[in-house]
Amino acid sequence: QFIQGIVGQTLTVEEAYQLARQTGLFLLSVAKHQLGSLDRVEQIVKLVAFVRCGADFMQQPKVANGVSDLLVEVFGEQGKHARSAVGVAALPGGMCFEAELIVKTC
């Protein structure tokens, strides 16, 4: 389920953190489907997080932590990654959060 909203206006940072975490679970399900098993993940390389927010909102990293924290919980040291957390004015369908994940496999 995609949640619409603007972080810092219609959604709190904590709500957005939890939604980002759900996005992380979705990304892991896609990875498992594509790879056959998450055991094939050697390293989480990079996460790019897009947070829909107003121009004065500066807490994008706190929102992106929802995905980052999950990846470290699941993969330990292999879950530590480079990251960009970007604030944007709009996302498809009015979504509040979107993410891309780069994974190194074995």
Residue ranges and their predicted role:
Residues 1-106:
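Short, polar/acidic, helix-capping and beta-turn segments at strand->helix junctions
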